[in-house]
Structure formats: C-alpha cells, structure tokens
C-alpha cells in the first residue's frame, strides 16, 4: 500500500544518526537514561510511525503484550502516523488489539492511511481520536503478481478475499454497511478530521489534551 504523499525521497533518517532524544531520570539509586519512546512506553503510550511492515508490526505487538502483562486493566494508547503497509502485518496488530484485555485507545497524528486507518478505527469504541489537521484515507488493498495464469488466478482470489475481510472489519467498527464500505473504498478516499468523525472512523477530534492517559 502506497503512502499518501512522498515529498522527499531522501528524508533525514534520525534513527540512523542516533538523534532519538534521551530522557534522564534521577532517583535515590542514581540516574537512568531512556530513549524517548521507551520513556513514553512507561506511560502506556505506543507509537506506530511510518509504514506498517513485519518489523514495525512485531514491535507494536510486543509492546501491547508487555503492557498487558504489566497491567491488564489500564488502557493503552496507540499513536498512529502511518501511510499504511502490509495487510498481513496490519491484521496481526489488529488481532492483537482485539485479543488483549486492556482497551486500546487510538490517536491519529498526521495521517492514518490504508492499513493505518483500519488500525485507527479498531481502537476501543469511544476512545478513538484524531488531531484537527490529521488526514485519514481508506481504500481497497493493492497487489500485483506475475507468473502462470493459474497462479495469478489464485492470488487474485486471495486479494479479493482480503478485500472482503477488510471491508467487514471497517463495517464492524464504523457501523457502516458493507455496501457503503465497498463503494467508499473503491478508490482512494481521503477524509479530514471532522469527516472521519462523521464516518465513525474515530469518535472525536482533540484540539487540546482533554483525555488524561492514566
């Protein structure tokens, strides 16, 4: 699945340059340094930033399971800024979100496109949010295959089956009909924050921090 916009092909890779901010905490036992994402994980905040890949999906899944083991009653917050990605990887995250006991609250920051949009709307009902200038995009799965005619037919059937399953998931979490979902995902369908609320992809637009993460 393709990103919404790709302004810079040679985007600065801050991870590779070691520019992830570090947080120093002092206690009676001395000082301890955390990278910023690990520190936020202590507050039960998980980030899904960038394409949904096997690697990023596995990291999110591991963090979800870890936070459930730490406290199975407290909500988990999943912040999403993603252009989408692998369907199977995204569905693995989706299944884990539904499987674990804590509610997973989702928040779109920037964009939630394709599989990112599905994960956004898969958050706990009443706890799905986006920021005012966020963009959400839904569409049908993309795919391509080369080979013998019989193999192409097999893969075409699989893509259609995935399309049907993704439509069912969107219908379940938005309360839209399957027919409506099929029509609205036939092509790339972009929605602003308020439109995403009207479509029931999210429950509210947050303009300031009104929801305290426990």
Swiss-Prot record:
KW Cytoplasm (keyword) present: yes
Keywords: Cytoplasm, Hydrolase, Protease, Serine protease
Keyword Lyase: no
Primary location: cytoplasm
One Pfam family matching this protein: CLP_protease
Gene3D superfamilies linked: 2-enoyl-CoA Hydratase, Chain A, domain 1
Catalyzed reactions per annotation: Hydrolysis of proteins to small peptides in the presence of ATP and magnesium. alpha-casein is the usual test substrate. In the absence of ATP, only oligopeptides shorter than five residues are hydrolyzed (such as succinyl-Leu-Tyr-|-NHMec, and Leu-Tyr-Leu-|-Tyr-Trp, in which cleavage of the -Tyr-|-Leu- and -Tyr-|-Trp bonds also occurs)
GO cellular component terms, A-Z: cytoplasm; endopeptidase Clp complex
Superkingdom, taxonomy of origin: Bacteria
Molecular function terms, GO-annotated: ATP-dependent peptidase activity; ATPase binding; serine-type endopeptidase activity
Quaternary structure, from the entry: Fourteen ClpP subunits assemble into 2 heptameric rings which stack back to back to give a disk-like structure with a central cavity, resembling the structure of eukaryotic proteasomes.
Name of the protein: ATP-dependent Clp protease proteolytic subunit
Organism: Nitrosomonas eutropha (strain DSM 101675 / C91 / Nm57)
């Amino acid at each position: 699945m393709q990103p919404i916009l790709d302004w810079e092909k040679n985007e600065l890779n801050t991870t590779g340059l070691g520019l992830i901010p570090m947080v120093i905490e002092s206690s009676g036992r001395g000082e301890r340094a955390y990278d910023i994402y690990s520190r936020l994980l202590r507050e039960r905040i998980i980030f899904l930033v960038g394409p949904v890949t096997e690697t990023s999906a596995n990291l999110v899944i591991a963090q979800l399971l870890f936070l459930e083991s730490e406290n199975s009653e407290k909500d988990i917050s999943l912040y999403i800024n993603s252009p989408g990605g692998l369907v199977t990887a995204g569905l693995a995250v989706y299944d884990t979100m539904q499987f674990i006991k804590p509610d997973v609250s989702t928040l779109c920051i920037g964009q939630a496109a394709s599989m990112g949009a599905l994960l956004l709307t898969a958050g706990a009902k009443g706890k799905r949010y986006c920021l005012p200038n966020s963009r959400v995009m839904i569409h049908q799965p993309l795919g391509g295959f080369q080979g013998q005619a019989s193999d192409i037919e097999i893969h075409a059937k699989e893509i259609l089956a995935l399309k049907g399953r993704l439509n069912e998931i969107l219908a379940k979490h938005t309360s839209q009909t399957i027919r409506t979902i099929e029509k609205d995902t036939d092509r790339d369908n972009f929605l602003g924050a308020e439109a995403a609320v009207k479509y029931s992809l999210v429950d509210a637009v947050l303009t300031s921090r009104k929801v305290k993460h426990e």
